[in-house]
């Protein structure tokens, strides 16, 4: 069993109170049954999350919308699981959705996992979204340093020369300076 799946199933087992419905969802091999959980009324969040995660790992695109909603959830473990499944889903809409979540100023408190997902995806949307998000985080007294740091580290990982100006700006921020130096060192010299 995949380590991320093991962690998620253990967390959801506790949430579900070890119910028979939980055990059935963990055991079923029927993707149609899992997809039905995503749309059936009255399903608990743990059931929808488990079904979406399992479908995502199987590459079943019916999980996409549910996983995107979970990626933007206020509970970080749900975001982590959704990002993991979305990275393996293979849906071409994933990068656009992650970029939209990462750059949404109304939901910036929940942008950490969309930012990390963009780095993992290495999609055309990744660098522009990370640059935009980081530019906004460089404002004075911005409270979202973890998001800013993830952007700096991600831009270094992606190694795109378009990130050089914003990373240079990040050098002036003590909480980001060391990571910005490392990120800039990973970006090829332009010109």
Residue ranges and their predicted role:
Residues 107-116, 120:
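A contiguous pocket-lining binding segment that forms or flanks enzyme active sites
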Residues 21-25, 54, 85-88, 117, ...:
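Core register positions within helices of long alpha-helical scaffolds
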Residues 19-20, 45-57, 80-85:
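Non-membrane alpha-helical segments in proteins
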Residues 18, 48, 79, 95, ...:
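Residue-level detector of extended alpha-helical repeat arrays and alpha-solenoid scaffolds
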Residues 2-8, 26-40, 60-72, 91-104, ...:
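Amphipathic alpha-helical scaffolding segments comprising HEAT/armadillo-like alpha-solenoid repeats
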Residues 42-44, 74-75, 106-107, 144, ...:
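Short inter-helical turns and helix N-cap capping residues of alpha-solenoid HEAT/ARM repeat scaffolds
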Residues 18-22, 51, 82, 114, ...:
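Conserved hydrophobic register position within alpha-solenoid helical repeats
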Residues 144-169:
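Extended alpha-helical scaffolding segments
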């Amino acid at each position: 069993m995949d380590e991320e799946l093991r962690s998620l199933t253990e967390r959801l087992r506790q949430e579900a109170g070890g119910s028979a419905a939980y055990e059935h969802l963990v055991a079923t091999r029927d993707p149609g049954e899992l997809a039905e959980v995503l749309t059936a009324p009255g399903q608990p969040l743990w059931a929808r999350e488990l079904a979406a995660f399992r479908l995502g790992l199987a590459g079943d695109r019916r999980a996409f919308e549910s996983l995107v909603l979970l990626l933007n959830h206020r509970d970080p473990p749900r975001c982590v699981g959704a990002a993991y499944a979305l990275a393996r889903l293979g849906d071409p809409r994933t990068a656009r959705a992650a970029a939209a979540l990462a750059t949404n100023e109304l939901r910036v408190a929940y942008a950490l996992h969309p930012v990390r997902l963009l780095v993992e995806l290495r999609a055309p949307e990744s660098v522009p979204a990370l640059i935009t998000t980081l530019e906004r985080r460089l404002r004075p007294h911005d409270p979202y340093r973890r998001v800013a740091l993830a952007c700096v580290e991600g831009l270094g990982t992606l190694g795109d020369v378009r990130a050089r100006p914003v990373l240079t700006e990040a050098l002036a921020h003590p909480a980001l300076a060391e990571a910005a130096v490392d990120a800039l060192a990973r970006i090829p010299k332009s010109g």
